[in-house]
Amino acid sequence: VLDALDDEIARLRKAIVDHIDQDPDLRQRRGWLESIPGISTRPSAVVLSHLDAFTRCATAKQWVAYAGLDCAIGQSGTSVRRRAAISKRGSAQLRRALYFPALSALTNNPIIRAFGDRLKGNGKRGKVVLCAAMRKLMHIIFGVLKNQQPFDPNAGLAVS
């Protein structure tokens, strides 16, 4: 049974890649996405599956909120104060697809590495840095797809 499921998963992954390869627009966008250090075939396919939502987002902030990586502050007057966390209101599939690319980007992407080092230097914990890296990766993905150009680390992205 497990072998049959593994075969089906492999067949579906190949079908997804073949579908992207057959459409020139999707193939070009996949190339732009995979030019970002940390993004490979599977995460780019997940991002491409959310293109409809991407076209409705006018700003990178909206795109980040769609993924549920925006900040949710729990505060009720002066009585209840909890630590800020990501809202998780958006696409869990997109967040899940960006988890390992963000880990990879913290070592391989110069912009996200400098950003993560700065946050660690400010005393932020590992998961906080990782969520911030996922958010930064979403901003980079937004810029690459909006500008319709491959990733360029020297293209004026602020390291903040």
Each predicted region: which residue ranges?
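A detector of single, family-specific signature residues
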Residues: 1-160
